[in-house]
Amino acid sequence: MNILHVLDHSVPLFSGYSFRSRSIIHAQRALGLNPVVLTSPKHRASTDSMEDIEGIRYHRTGALAEDGAGAIPFVGELKQMLCMARRIEQVARQEKSDLIHSHSPLLNGLPALWVATRLKIPLVYEARAFWEDAAVDHGTFAEDSFRYRVSHGLETFLFKHTDHAVTICEAMRQDLQKRGVAIDDVSVVPNGVNIDEFQPIKRCKTLADKLGLNGGPVFGFVGSFYRYEGLRFIVESFPKIRAQIPNATLLLVGGGEEEQALKELAREQSGVHFTGRVPHQHVMDYYSLVDIFVCPRLRMRLTELVTPLKPLEGMAMGKAILASDVGGHKELIDDGRTGCLFAAESVDDLVSQSVRLANDPALRAKLGDAGRRFVVEERSWEKLSRRYLQLYSNALNAQREKALASVPVSEK
């Protein structure tokens, strides 16, 4: 079965989006499928029209010309979608694709719908988050603005007309049902982890010495510093944590839009380490130093609906997870068993729970063991990828039945 995955961006760019995509594609290949990839103009890391990465063909779409169109509402988006439609059809024909699997955002999904309809092949549309909500957090437009409502309406249209839809969590699936999307046409394939890659490892003493870690409990976060991650709360809380746990350390690994603001907030503090972005092959060494993996996401529509990947990676590595009680975390974490939740945006509760975990190594070990067990049993990509195999088969069978039904009785 030839599957064309349409992505916003991919490896070698590193993000939660690209890591999920990579995991899905490699797991599908292991199941005997033939996945190939097409990325949008937003992927700017490659200049070749096609490259081979880990045995997978990645087709690229060149960057759009800078002509000022992007400054006009909807014009830049329309230009990108027309470009993507041409490229999707070109690659789908070249690769003899049996099915198109488009991943959010909407700017991929609508062109994929046009092409799938034209080529008479099934389309699966997968939403990692709702594009309009992510755009609000990034400041692209305001909630309930005209652009928000248009984006919301167009994606609802897409969900209703795709052959099958996929979300990463149950909250998103329920949201689509409220929009009038048939619940049976939506499957949940949650975030997963490569459990062979992410597993408990010994502390990297060389790196600990290099960073000057003093043997006390290490609170950590590994990922992109987006505003919705709420990292300012752990930075603001840390002096209060250090007042009770003087040898505690906060290790922030990564970078992004909030990096400079966080560094300024921590400028007068002790025990806060910013590593910047680190090469992917060294990320596990930094994970090995963390005792308590902190996920202090803010409370907003995006975080209430969407389940993140990072807590699962921490669980897979046997770390104690401390996360805010937003909906996305509550769908992942069994409070007190596979992690601990604190009241979102509450410095006092974050400090209280942090001190409790820092003072109780046995509890941390218990949470880490249970978290690892949960990931191995329920969130390994080896198991999750089989859901795609079934829904692809269903979509192809439905397409064949539709084609057969359109044939006049006299010709059957």
Task: Describe the function of each predicted region.
Residues 1-62, 241, 400, 404, ...:
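N-terminal subdomain of nucleotide-sugar transferases
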Residues 4-6, 213-238:
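Conserved donor-binding/catalytic core segment of Leloir-type glycosyltransferases
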Residues 50, 199-213:
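A short helix/loop element that forms part of the nucleotide-sugar donor recognition site in Leloir-type
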Residues 95-99, 163, 288-304, 319-320:
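Acidic donor-binding loop of glycosyltransferase active sites
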Residues 171, 192:
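Carbohydrate-associated surface elements
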Residues 260-284:
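Nucleotide-activated donor-binding/catalytic signature segment of Leloir-type glycosyltransferases, i.e.
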Residues 295, 313-316, 320-323, 333:
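Short hydrophobic beta-strand element within catalytic cores of glycosyltransferases
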Residues 334-336, 340-347, 356-362, 377:
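Conserved acidic donor-binding segment of nucleotide-sugar-dependent glycosyltransferases
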